[in-house]
Amino acid sequence: MIQSGIGHLRAIQMRSVASEVVYKRLGGEPLAVRAVVGRTVFRSTDADGIWTRVETRDFIVPKEQLPFEPQVGDEVEFLGATYEVLAPNGEPAWRWSDAFHTAYRIHAKHTGG
């Protein structure tokens, strides 16, 4: 029941709040997908006790729209700006957006445009 509810909500999300983005795999062809745009704040402490805060632009893309796992170095174009997929502070470059693995939450940083 929860899984079907998540599927239903994901469909509403894609119709209502998702934006068109272009995903470019490193060395691959551009792929137009719909993504919900968000952010994640990562915090860590280095060996000297200094706090680091990194904020990423996140793109939540349904798994069926992206036929491969996102990789560090891939790029996302959104509203004329380019974002590079990255792994901040040793974190993974992406996470599953939910417990049923229906969408990638891809972490990226603005690099130009």
Region annotations inferred by a language model:
Residues R25-G113:
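Short, conserved turn/kink motifs that form compact alpha/beta structural patches or helix kinks used as
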